[in-house]
């Protein structure tokens, strides 16, 4: 051998702690929140994360001499304190692009959040953010259609899309399920959806559901003269079954299908997104299982990372929480990952949880979906927070109306249009929310009843995962 080989164990920081390194534009950058075991220096723990998520192992190995370790290794180039947390710190790591397969989110996550999360030198580890370089983004398919194309397909402009999840989400026969879809769509909603856990159960097989839903959508379109749709969940036991369901939705001339991207997996999701792009189908994405991964403030993966990965893997709509509803998520954090779903460039902004500038180039945007514990009183705040390029989904806030789902849908439609009209007239819709809604209710008995029904319903719990800012 031309180089000397010294067997044994050496400290990670000797190789992977490089504070003088200046990241390249082509590097994939990651920010981890690290909590090491007591007595282990920060630099050693951070370097261990860089090593174990790239080229390193616990021992010096002779085969390192067969490659260019200096070229391929991950480098921890910066360490920062976490505001208000004396135990943890931020480790910023740069990875050369050649470590990752082109267009493969699966491969990126296998490296960054693989075995390193079980490393004994760590008490906790959380992936807070990723900066994907443009050279990698250009290898990803991204959203199969994007916001502009979706609006054209649905012929909906100048306001958020309005939808709901069918309830009860489990237990209905296919025919009764279709009846509920019809009631919601004829009442004024643009879209209805399968819940994340409705696939093909004994009480309702998928083909039966698809057929009755297609009939309901077409009847509602004929009655209202509007384009309607329903998110048909194609998540299945195998990829082959998933594609079979997608093909049948296409045969029924349905405009949009759905996938549970975390439980279904990024490989399946990317494949389905590619199919949708080729077949002119919109793709709605549910984030079931996300909170298992992202809710602990010191361990796991932040949802902003999962949202970025979804935009690259492919989806036209993604659930993001509501801020005001029953699900976890504060306003600034939510706005931070909504920006990364929709904008072409997102600057670093710690007040929104964004640790890096992120350039998305010409990649299409993704509709942010607000769903979970929302009702008509939330409409002004939802419009102010999410803006027009969003989908507002009221499940219980539609079906729980005393007069039924059609009346609940009508109430939500009137409330939305009243808020959009008030905003366009220059009114401060959050401050004037009560006046705006009460004025609209004078001409809508459905809205008046909805306002009375849900006037005391609030979800005022403190956020578990807060931004690390002072």
From Swiss-Prot:
UniProt GO MF annotations: magnesium ion binding; monooxygenase activity; ribulose-bisphosphate carboxylase activity
Subcellular location: Carboxysome
Residues bearing the modification N6-carboxylysine: 193
One Pfam family, short name: RuBisCO_large
Residues annotated for Mg(2+) binding in this entry: 193, 195-196
InterPro entries: RuBisCO (IPR033966), RuBisCO_lsu_C (IPR000685), RuBisCO_lsu_C_sf (IPR036376), RuBisCO_lsu_fd_N (IPR017443), RuBisCO_lsu_N_sf (IPR036422), RuBisCO_lsuI (IPR020888)
One cellular component (GO) term of this entry: carboxysome
Binding-site positions, substrate: 115, 165, 169, 287, 319, 371
The enzyme's E.C. designation: 4.1.1.39
Keywords associated with the record: Bacterial microcompartment, Calvin cycle, Carbon dioxide fixation, Carboxysome, Lyase, Magnesium, Metal-binding, Monooxygenase, Oxidoreductase, Photorespiration, Photosynthesis
Reactions catalysed: 2 (2R)-3-phosphoglycerate + 2 H(+) = D-ribulose 1,5-bisphosphate + CO2 + H2O; D-ribulose 1,5-bisphosphate + O2 = 2-phosphoglycolate + (2R)-3-phosphoglycerate + 2 H(+)
PANTHER family xrefs: RIBULOSE BISPHOSPHATE CARBOXYLASE, RIBULOSE BISPHOSPHATE CARBOXYLASE LARGE CHAIN
Name recorded for this polypeptide: Ribulose bisphosphate carboxylase large chain
Gene source species: Prochlorococcus marinus (strain MIT 9303)
Gene (UniProt): cbbL
């Amino acid at each position: 051998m031309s180089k000397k080989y010294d067997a044994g164990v050496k400290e990670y920081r000797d190789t992977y702690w490089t504070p003088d390194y200046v990241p390249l534009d082509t590097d994939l950058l990651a920010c981890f929140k690290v909590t090491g075991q007591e007595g282990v220096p920060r630099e050693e723990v951070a370097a261990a994360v860089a090593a174990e998520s790239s080229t390193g192992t616990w021992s010096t190995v002779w085969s390192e001499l067969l490659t260019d370790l200096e070229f391929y290794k991950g480098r921890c180039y910066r360490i920062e304190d976490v505001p208000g947390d004396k135990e943890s710190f931020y480790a910023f790591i740069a990875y050369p692009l050649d470590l990752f397969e082109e267009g493969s989110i699966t491969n990126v996550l296998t490296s960054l959040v693989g075995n390193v999360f079980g490393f004994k030198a760590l008490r906790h580890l959380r992936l807070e953010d990723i900066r994907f370089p443009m050279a990698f983004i250009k290898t990803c398919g991204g959203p199969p259609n994007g916001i502009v194309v979706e609006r054209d397909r649905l012929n909906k402009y100048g306001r958020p899309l309005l939808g709901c999840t069918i309830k009860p989400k489990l237990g209905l026969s296919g025919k009764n399920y279709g009846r509920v879809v019809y009631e919601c769509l004829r009442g004024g909603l643009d879209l209805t959806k399968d819940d994340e856990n409705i696939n093909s159960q004994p009480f309702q097989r998928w083909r039966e559901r698809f057929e009755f839903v297609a009939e309901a959508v077409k009847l509602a379109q004929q009655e209202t003269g509007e384009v309607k749709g329903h998110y048909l969940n194609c998540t299945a036991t195998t990829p082959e079954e998933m594609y079979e369901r997608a093909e049948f939705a296409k045969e029924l001339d349905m405009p949009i299908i759905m996938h549970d991207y975390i439980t279904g997996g990024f490989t399946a999701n990317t494949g389905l997104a590619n199919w949708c792009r080729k077949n002119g189908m919109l793709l709605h994405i549910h984030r079931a299982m996300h909170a298992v991964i992202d809710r602990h403030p010191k361990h796991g993966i932040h949802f902003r990372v999962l949202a970025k990965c979804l935009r690259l893997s492919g989806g036209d709509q993604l659930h993001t929480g509501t801020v005001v509803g029953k699900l976890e998520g504060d306003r600034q954090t939510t706005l931070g990952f909504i920006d990364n779903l929709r904008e072409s460039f997102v600057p670093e902004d710690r007040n929104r949880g964004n640790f890096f500038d992120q350039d998305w180039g010409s990649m299409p945007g993704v509709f942010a979906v607000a769903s979970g514990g929302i009702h008509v009183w939330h409409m002004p705040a939802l419009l102010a927070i999410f803006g027009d390029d969003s989908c507002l989904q009221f499940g219980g806030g539609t079906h729980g109306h005393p007069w039924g789902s059609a009346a609940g849908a009508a109430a939500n439609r009137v409330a939305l249009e009243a808020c959009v009209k008030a905003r366009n007239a220059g009114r401060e819709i959050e401050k004037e929310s009560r006046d705006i809604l009460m004025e609209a209710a004078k001409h809508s008995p459905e809205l008046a009843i909805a306002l009375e029904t849900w006037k005391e319903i609030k979800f005022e719990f403190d956020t578990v995962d807060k931004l690390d800012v002072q």
